[in-house]
């Protein structure tokens, strides 16, 4: 369980924040030259630092963390790092979707209301609570289709360069949103937490790519607006291999503010501990199973990523993973008012985000740590017959079960 890595994670983060990071652009092509995330010490005036160094920040952070993101000319970097008001200077980097295996999705025509196999498998449709509109879910992603008839979009914001709104120009974020919260209104598809309020927080562009500074800006916005807008859950189906002290600190502060973060484990088929934010000890990290019929028993047809009721061949794994959920051939909403099927831990994660919202609708004062405990207590233990044949590690995370939640 993740509790086994909390102390190591906190120690690493504190050490990293306390010392400037070396320049590693030559070693990591995803680091963006001359772009930095600057964290300031408590009480430092951001404007004074910015003006003093002649910077023009792209983003200001003031709720989850205290600092800014800016282009810093090479000749000024050393002076900035040595400024007594600066806690850390971290290179900005490229962040991508937790690559969904079926890159563009398969278009689907939906008649009436379809019950996706994932929602069926976690028994979300059998829970007596049918409306979760009191809870807000932030989709930190490529945006959400703001006009989709099957989604209750309550607000949007964008931090992706060159965009003017949180509208989805990729499709991934809309798909994630529908899994979590598509309306149960007799039309389209049904989500795990029907009609939950969705907040589109666009931090990735049309290609599903963005910058770490954009993601931190998204987390900062969620933290700022959580109380006023009722945002109790945030889904992040994105990440990168490595660690970021700034992102770690931002998520930690947002969780402390009461937001439950649910994160995809990743699709590299390796240990999820290598990836951020999946390795953050305070988030709920989700792996994926292959399920083709929405039922336990292994009697459905085989998929491209494993037999029915097996651990998805692409899914990351390891002790940082908290729960498993369906993530293969998942039907959900898509951009431009359409529907599509996608595969990936990106699709598994919003099942759990929806379940968290489901529980919080009835118990709104529950802390993120308590939400995880409740989801795990009500989850289905792993058996080879019911979704876990092929899990490569010795730690067997349980399968999400919504029906048994209070």
Question: Which functions belong to the PLM regions below?
Answer:
Residues 125-156, 165-214, 227-233, 243, ...:
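Subtilisin-like serine protease catalytic core
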Residues 22-26, 51-65, 82-136, 144, ...:
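Protease zymogen maturation seam
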Residues 32-39:
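Short glycine-/aliphatic-rich beta-strand segments at the starts of folded cytosolic domains
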Residues 163-177, 270, 340-352:
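Gly/Ser-rich catalytic serine loop of serine hydrolases
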Residues 135, 141-143, 259, 275-361, ...:
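Extracellular S/T/G-rich loop segment that most often corresponds to the catalytic His/Ser-adjacent loop
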Residues 2-19:
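Gram-negative bacterial Sec-dependent N-terminal signal peptides
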Residues 39-42, 72-73, 90-94, 139-143, ...:
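Active-site-proximal beta-strand/loop segments in catalytic clefts of secreted hydrolases
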Residues 28, 57-62, 190-196, 200, ...:
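C-terminal subdomain of the subtilisin-like protease fold in secreted/lumenal serine endopeptidases
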């Amino acid at each position: 369980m993740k509790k086994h890595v909390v102390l190591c994670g906190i120690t690493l983060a504190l050490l990293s924040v306390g010392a400037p990071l070396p320049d590693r652009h030559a070693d990591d092509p995803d680091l963006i030259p001359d772009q930095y995330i600057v964290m300031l010490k408590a009480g430092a005036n951001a404007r004074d630092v910015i003006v003093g160094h002649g910077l023009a920040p792209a983003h200001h952070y003031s709720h989850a963390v205290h600092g800014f993101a800016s282009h810093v000319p090479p000749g000024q970097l050393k002076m900035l790092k040595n400024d007594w008001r600066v806690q850390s200077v971290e290179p900005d980097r490229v962040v991508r979707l937790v690559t969904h295996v079926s890159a563009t999705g398969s278009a689907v025509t939906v008649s009436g209301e379809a019950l996706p196999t994932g929602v069926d498998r976690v028994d979300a449709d059998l829970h007596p609570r049918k409306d979760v509109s009191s809870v807000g879910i932030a989709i930190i992603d490529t945006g959400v289709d703001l006009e989709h008839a099957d989604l209750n979009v309550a607000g949007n914001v964008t931090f992706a360069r060159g965009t003017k709104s949180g509208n989805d120009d990729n499709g991934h974020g809309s798909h994630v949103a529908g899994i979590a919260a598509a309306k149960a209104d007799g039309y389209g598809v049904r989500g795990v937490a029907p009609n939950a309020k969705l907040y589109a927080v666009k931090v990735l562009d049309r290609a599903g790519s963005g910058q770490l500074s954009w993601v931190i800006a998204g987390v900062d916005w969620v933290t700022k607006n959580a109380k006023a807008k009722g945002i109790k859950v945030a889904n992040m189906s994105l990440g990168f291999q490595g660690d970021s002290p700034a992102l770690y600190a931002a998520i930690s502060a947002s969780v402390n503010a009461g937001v439950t973060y649910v994160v995809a484990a990743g699709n590299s088929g390796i240990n999820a501990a290598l990836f951020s934010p999946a390795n953050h000890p305070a988030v709920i990290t989700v792996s994926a199973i292959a399920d083709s019929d929405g039922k336990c028993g292994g009697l459905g047809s085989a998929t491209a990523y494993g037999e029915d009721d097996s651990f998805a061949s692409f899914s990351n794994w390891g002790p940082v993973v908290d729960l498993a959920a369906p993530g293969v051939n998942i039907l959900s909403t898509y951009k431009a008012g359409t529907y599509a099927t996608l595969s990936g831990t990106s699709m598994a994660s919003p099942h759990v985000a929806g379940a968290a919202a489901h529980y919080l609708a009835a118990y709104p004062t529950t802390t993120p740590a308590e939400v995880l405990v409740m989801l795990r207590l009500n989850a289905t233990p792993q058996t080879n017959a019911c979704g876990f044949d092929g899990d490569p590690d010795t730690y067997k995370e349980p399968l999400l079960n919504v029906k048994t939640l209070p």
